[in-house]
């Protein structure tokens, strides 16, 4: 039985193709029960690799079934047919994804970015409180509903965190995601704290929201890693970002995993909290550290004209809600160059100012 017939029997009228990979595709469909359009991810077990079937797909299905948050794509139904096809019926991002939105409209104003970033951060806190990590946070996985609210999608790399006998989270050894959003410890192949990895990716996303460009050029991974480990974050002067916004980004893009912000610290940061905005620069001391953890510590260097931010170039192809690449094997670095996936230009922004550099981070074991 073909997909249209299977979906028809379940009360869905199949629509257009939204995306297709080697063993999965996404179709739009109209739900006769819900009375609106949905997205249907169809996975063919016969074509999928064994590691995906044995590890990643069961994790994704388990996690999708347990999540219920206003800023996470809803999963309405999951079913499987006798011929080995899995159907995941999900909320449709009717306004596309955040990357295409920014490519079309440019960088967001801080108030709009704050709203969207708060929605995303609230979704991540919800997940982290459940010991669920996403591990593939990027603008393409942030869908927009009819009112342009953020809907976190694609839990293909997600997992439940395990704890040891003392209650500490066990480090992850699956190195996954896109290089442009990957934390330094992941790029280096070091076993990592998955929740802390998510925080780095949040920092990259916020940078893209307010700058309209990537914070790092991933065409040269070794060079990018060196810049990241030196804690260099360059902001376009033309964007006139507030110190509070730069400070939050700088703290999330902290190479030292022991100093990187926790999700609760992000949500309590003065830029995210409406009542705390407008903090005077007097709260920052000479060393660039604030008197409270949530106050700005970012200090620009006058005259700096470094090059690391990479422009986003418009793409012709629309982004689908489903990932098409296979999942990685354990202990194998599988980060993907973002420029290969989304058509980023290697041209660099020159109109930048650099964040206050820190000492190189200590080796994390």
From Swiss-Prot:
One Pfam family recorded for the sequence: Pkinase
Modified how: Autophosphorylated. Ubiquitinated; HSP90 activity negatively regulates ubiquitination and degradation.
Bias (Basic and acidic residues) ranges: 303-330
Biological processes per GO annotation: peptidyl-serine phosphorylation; protein phosphorylation; spermatid development; spermatogenesis
Binding annotation for ATP: 18-26, 41
Entry annotated with the keyword Cytoplasm: yes
SMART domains: S_TKc
Tissue specificity field: Testis-specific. Expressed only in postmeiotic spermatids at the final stages of cytodifferentiation in the seminiferous tubules (at protein level). Not detected in released sperms in the lumen of the seminiferous tubules and the epididymis.
Cofactor: Mg(2+)
Listed SUPFAM superfamilies: Protein kinase-like (PK-like)
Enzyme superclass (EC): transferase
Residues annotated as catalytic: 136 (proton acceptor)
Region of interest: Disordered: 282-365
Annotated EC: 2.7.11.1
Residues bearing PTM Phosphothreonine: 174
GO molecular function, one term: magnesium ion binding
CDD domains: STKc_TSSK1_2-like
Keyword vocabulary terms for this entry: ATP-binding, Cell projection, Cilium, Cytoplasm, Cytoplasmic vesicle, Developmental protein, Differentiation, Flagellum, Kinase, Magnesium, Metal-binding, Nucleotide-binding, Phosphoprotein, Serine/threonine-protein kinase, Spermatogenesis, Transferase, Ubl conjugation
Cell location: Cytoplasm; Cytoplasmic vesicle, Secretory vesicle, Acrosome; Cell projection, Cilium, Flagellum
Complex and partners: Interacts with TSSK2. Interacts with HSP90; this interaction stabilizes TSSK1.
Family membership: Belongs to the protein kinase superfamily. CAMK Ser/Thr protein kinase family.
Protein name listed in UniProt: Testis-specific serine/threonine-protein kinase 1
Upper lineage: Eukaryota, Metazoa, Chordata, Craniata, Vertebrata
